[in-house]
């Protein structure tokens, strides 16, 4: 599977993040994100979503193929973990400290994967939702342009699989005026998830939501515009706090 790999030194075991980009872009988008992680002592493992980047199939750039894309990539995440444990990498990707994250469609896949047994220590998503039923039902803020089979939506909808969601630290970043993925759906999902944490005896404060208003980003959806630096700093701080990387050696 095509992947962009980055590591603080390629010698010392380091925690890492599997990152899933959004629809219509590719794994090379936003290299500054990966550079920040590496400088903080965290490895980056960014993969192309099905039909994107080096796996190009233009049909997968259409909203009509989103469910196919999500279904496929959720099933591929364990393949990525297995590949990183191969001898050729010399154990530099610490299998005891993996994290996962994604933006928009990549965040949806991230949240669905977390509803099944997994090894991840923490997760970070942005501009996404865990309530696909609400997203595809449309809303005054964002009527969805494609009608999907409700049964297929339910299969990949994190909100329909919360019973399997093991409490871990979760950071969600969102623009309050997001026109593609309205924040209301994510707020409702996170509240349901907090209740799930409570029932499991976990602290609901493990779930963090950071919002940004009037970012200036296209459709208030991608990159957080004038707050992009703040968003990236918040994400790095969260990852460092929970993955406990060793800072790269000076020089």
Annotate each predicted stretch with a short phrase.
Residues 133-198:
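The feature captures the conserved acid-bearing segment of alpha/beta-hydrolase catalytic domains
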Residues 198-251:
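C-terminal catalytic histidine-bearing segment of alpha/beta-hydrolase fold enzymes
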Residues 13-22:
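Short beta-strand element of the alpha/beta-hydrolase
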Residues 64-90:
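Alpha/beta-hydrolase active-site loop
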Residues 24-36, 49:
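The serine-hydrolase catalytic nucleophile loop
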């Amino acid at each position: 599977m095509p992947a962009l790999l980055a590591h603080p030194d390629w010698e010392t075991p380091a925690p890492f993040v599997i990152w899933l980009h959004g629809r219509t872009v590719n794994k090379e988008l936003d290299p500054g994100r990966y550079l920040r992680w590496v400088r903080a002592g965290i490895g980056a493992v960014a993969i192309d979503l099905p039909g994107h980047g080096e796996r190009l199939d233009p049909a997968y750039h259409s909203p009509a193929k989103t469910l196919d894309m999500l279904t496929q990539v959720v099933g591929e995440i364990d393949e990525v973990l297995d590949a990183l444990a191969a001898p050729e990498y010399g154990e530099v990707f610490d299998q005891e400290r993996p994290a996962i994250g994604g933006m928009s469609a990549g965040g949806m896949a991230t949240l669905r994967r977390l509803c099944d047994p997994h090894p991840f220590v923490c997760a970070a998503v942005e501009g996404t939702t865990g309530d696909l039923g609400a997203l595809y039902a449309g809303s005054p803020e964002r009527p969805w342009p494609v009608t999907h089979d409700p049964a297929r939506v339910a299969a990949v909808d994190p909100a329909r699989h919360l019973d399997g969601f093991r409490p871990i630290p979760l950071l969600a970043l969102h623009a309050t005026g997001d026109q593609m993925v309205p924040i209301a759906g994510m707020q409702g999902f996170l509240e349901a998830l907090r209740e799930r944490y409570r029932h499991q005896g976990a602290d609901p404060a493990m779930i963090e939501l950071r919002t940004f208003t009037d970012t200036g980003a296209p459709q208030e959806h991608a990159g957080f515009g004038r707050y992009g630096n703040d968003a990236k700093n918040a994400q790095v701080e969260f990852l460092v706090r929970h993955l406990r990387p060793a800072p790269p050696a000076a020089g």
